[in-house]
């Protein structure tokens, strides 16, 4: 009986830590991905972006879903404030690049101001310690189109030019996530 309890406890510990998001002070995994800005695909490199300053890397479940639409819109309308604080922003989801081309140009969401990157197999999200769930049969977006891909957790990482995570923000509403992220980025310069 004790052996069974020990085994269950060990498995639970592995399961919990397997999806523990990176914390402040940890090295942020570098990544390169296809991304889109204002409907145009390009090759994104976190290492190159960090040469210009702090980078907000925010993971979201899927383009054109309720919470993600709100979050993208809020990042987009606050982009000048992020830039003034010395930060750029990149959204990351398991959406394919064609879908992100539409999302990045959509005037209601990214509005051409917010770059979004494609992580089709979830490997970038997993490298940040995030849980990636499989596709849900029949799941549709706010446009009524089938989503057809998996989902990463909604978590935001603020990565400083030295490649370290300054703060991890998760477990809050999409709008609150953006507000907290902006406040944290602005606080880095004080």
Q: Where would I find each of the regions flagged by the language model?
A:
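N-proximal helix/coil linker or "cap" segments that precede and/or mark the start of modular domains
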Residues: 5-35
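A short beta-strand-turn-helix
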Residues: 32-54
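Residue-level recognition of short loop/turn positions
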Residues: 37-38, 121, 162
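Residue-level structural signal for beta-strand termini and adjacent loop
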Residues: 46-47, 130, 171
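Short active-site neighborhood of thiol/selenol oxidoreductases, capturing the structured segment around
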Residues: 46-75
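Thiol-/selenol-based redox modules, centered on thioredoxin-like
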Residues: 141-190
């Amino acid at each position: 009986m004790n052996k069974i309890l020990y085994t269950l406890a060990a498995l639970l510990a592995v399961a919990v830590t397997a999806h523990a998001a990176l914390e402040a002070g940890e090295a942020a995994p570098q990544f390169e991905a296809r991304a889109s800005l204002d409907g145009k695909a390009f090759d994104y490199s976190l290492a190159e972006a960090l040469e210009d300053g702090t980078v907000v890397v925010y993971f979201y479940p899927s383009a054109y879903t309720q919470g993600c639409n709100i979050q993208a819109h809020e990042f987009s309308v606050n982009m000048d404030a992020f830039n003034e604080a010395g930060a750029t922003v990149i959204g990351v989801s398991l959406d394919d690049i064609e879908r992100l081309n539409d999302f990045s140009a959509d005037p209601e969401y990214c509005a051409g101001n917010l770059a979004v990157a494609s992580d089709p197999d979830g490997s970038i999200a997993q490298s940040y310690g995030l849980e990636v769930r499989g596709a849900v049969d029949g799941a549709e977006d706010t446009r009524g189109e089938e989503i057809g891909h998996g989902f990463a957790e909604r978590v935001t990482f603020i990565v400083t030019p030295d490649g370290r995570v300054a703060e991890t923000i998760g477990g809050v509403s999409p709008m609150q996530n953006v507000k907290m992220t902006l406040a944290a980025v602005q606080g880095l310069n004080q």
